[in-house]
UniProtKB/Swiss-Prot annotation:
It comes from the Bacteria. NCBIfam families: RNasePH (TIGR01966). It catalyses: tRNA(n+1) + phosphate = tRNA(n) + a ribonucleoside 5'-diphosphate. One of its GO terms (biological process) is rRNA catabolic process. InterPro entries: ExoRNase_PH_dom1, ExoRNase_PH_dom2, ExoRNase_PH_dom2_sf, PNPase/RNase_PH_dom_sf, Ribosomal_Su5_D2-typ_SF, RNase_PH, RNase_PH_bac-type, RNase_PH_CS. The gene is rph. GO terms for molecular function: 3'-5'-RNA exonuclease activity; tRNA binding; tRNA nucleotidyltransferase activity. Phosphorolytic 3'-5' exoribonuclease that plays an important role in tRNA 3'-end maturation. Removes nucleotide residues following the 3'-CCA terminus of tRNAs; can also add nucleotides to the ends of RNA molecules by using nucleoside diphosphates as substrates, but this may not be physiologically important. Probably plays a role in initiation of 16S rRNA degradation (leading to ribosome degradation) during starvation. Homohexameric ring arranged as a trimer of dimers. Phosphate binds at R89, G127, T128, R129. It comes from Xanthomonas axonopodis pv. citri (strain 306). This is Ribonuclease PH.
Length: 241
């Protein structure tokens, strides 16, 4: 039986990825990132203050918030603000985004400033957290480039690029960049965050159906590295445009 994906993509093929800069007017950095039908608005906001634990230390901070619009999925979900608290999934994802982006920033060069990345899912079709990280990096880069242009900082605080992609085992085959039909029916699901130097920042992998073997893990990481190379090229092209 010939293996096929619901989308018709090959096992090592990303969905069509678009990175649109300056999508909104007011934020220092603003990006609409699309991975196929998944669309996330990422904005970077700069404030001249830091959390209490960093006051007087001369260091900056990078953090993130994440949320999904009520009808970003097949059925409407209540806004978390209406429920009075954020869910565990939301907190997990926004902490992941913050950790990923702090890994590419020299916080001493940033000075006592906070950059907040707000990642709002407009439409979800799998891979929202990886799309958010990939787009938020470009929004962050735009924000720090503006700080340099205005003379607010002298040294560029970015020490490399960061992107993320999902991989998984779907119907027994390792695949790259899972969409919703694959994500909801896969044997293994993994999110990979890397820098453009080839270093791994975070791996989140879970066996959904059956335990995965070491050779399958190696195959998944190889797929992630291939996809990451394409994503870094897209980020560079977007920032050069």
């Amino acid at each position: 039986m010939t293996f096929s994906r619901p989308s018709g993509r090959t096992a090592d093929q990303l969905r069509p990825v678009r990175i649109e800069r300056s999508f909104t007017r007011h934020a220092e950095g603003s990006v609409l990132v699309s991975f196929g039908d998944t669309r996330v608005l990422c904005t970077a906001s700069v404030e001249n203050r830091v959390p209490g634990f960093l006051r007087g230390k001369g260091e900056g901070w990078v953090t993130a918030e994440y949320g999904m619009l009520p009808r970003s999925t097949h059925t409407r979900s209540d806004r978390e603000a209406a429920r009075g608290k954020q869910g565990g999934r939301t907190l997990e994802i926004q902490r992941l985004i913050g950790r990923a982006l702090r890994a590419c920033v020299d916080r001493n060069a940033l000075g006592e400033r906070t950059i907040t990345l707000d990642c709002d899912v407009l439409q979800a079709d799998g891979g929202t957290r990886t799309a958010a990280i990939t787009g938020a990096y470009v929004a962050l880069a735009d924000a720090v480039n503006l700080l340099i242009k205005r003379g607010d900082i002298k040294k560029h605080p970015l020490i490399g690029a960061v992107a993320a992609v999902s991989v998984g085992i779907y119907r027994g085959e390792p695949v790259l960049d899972l969409d919703y039909p694959e994500d909801s029916d896969c044997d293994t699901d993994m999110n990979v965050v890397m820098n453009d130097g080839g270093g791994f920042i975070e791996l989140q992998g879970t066996a959904e159906g059956h335990a995965f073997r070491r050779d399958e893990l190696n195959a998944l990481l190889a797929l992630a590295e291939k996809g990451m190379g394409e994503l870094f090229a897209l980020q560079r092209a977007a920032l050069a445009g």
